Amino acid sequence: MATLTNVNDKIIAQRALEGFTEYLHPMNLFSTSYSDETKNKGDTIIVPLVGTLTATTFNQDYQVGGGTLTAVTINLNVHKIVPLSLTDVQFANSSVAQLEKWGFQAGQALATAITQHVFSYVTSGSPSFFNTAYTYPVASWNVSRIATIRQAMTVAKVPMDNRSLFLDPTAYSQTLSDTNISYAMYAGTNDALREGRVPRVYGFDIRESNLIPTTDTMYGFACHPSALALAIRALAPQAPSAYEAAGVVTNAETGAALGMRRHYQPSNGTHYLNFEAIFGATYGITAGLSRIAFR
């Protein structure tokens, strides 16, 4: 089986993994299953939902059925690739910096495609699983709205840890410029001013995203990891020996992995590189996510 033994292959694959991991990071706020094991399209993965265990009274027996972990089954039914072609001269003479740039962009593009797929489950155009619970005009969005959302989620018994709030650039900018955030900055953190980054607010990790679907004028959503589940695997090549290089690179910390394969076409002197993953997503617990829109 061909592997990633060529120095250039290793460089570009490693940078692709770094771009993939960095841009996939927001997906860690959902229930996920990542692994370096290869799978085929159509295979299924069982993913436990975060925060669904419950306690039961001990009755002199540890073999009890209570406390069963809720899980969902995900079909790996989506296959995305990021293609890159280089002539043999380009490939041989590419600088390390160029290879790193191409690799990072390829990983970023693959992670973006996965994020867009997961976010499509939040729209009302998909099965009516989540409610549009909050209908604030975008112009009126501020930190006090987050406090209202927090209270409603707590009353609905959504776990109080691991909550996150995704906002489009407009709503995020208004959060960033809110005077309460400014006061917090003066109290000790200058992330808002220096990095343009909103810190945690009222128990929520605040995330800016320009990938939030605008269906029904949605501009954000509040969620718990139990709301959505995602599984990602590398695709197993059908004929590994047919490639100049083929392999899987894995992030040791998160387990996120992507596949890379390269083949050469002598007729036009071109190397074809493809970075890929197969994945799937599904709904978890209804109360775990609420859309925010202006109507």
Provide a role label for each language-model segment.
Residues 1-76, 293:
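N-terminal "assembly arms/tails" that initiate or stabilize quaternary assembly
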Residues 2-7, 57, 91, 105-136, ...:
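Signature of extracytoplasmic/envelope-associated structural regions
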Residues 4-17, 21, 236-239, 247, ...:
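Surface-exposed molecular-recognition determinants
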Residues 47, 72-131, 156-169, 206, ...:
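Long, contiguous amphipathic alpha-helices that act as assembly "spine/axial" helices in icosahedral shell
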Residues 55-58, 94, 174-177, 184, ...:
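Short helix/loop capping segments that flank catalytic or ligand/cofactor-binding pockets
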Residues 127-204:
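Extended, solvent-exposed, turn-rich assembly/linker loops in the middle of proteins
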Residues 186-237, 262, 267, 274-277:
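A structural signal for small-residue-enriched, beta-sheet-centric alpha/beta enzyme cores
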Residues 252-295:
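Extended, compositionally biased alpha-helical segments that mediate assembly or anchoring
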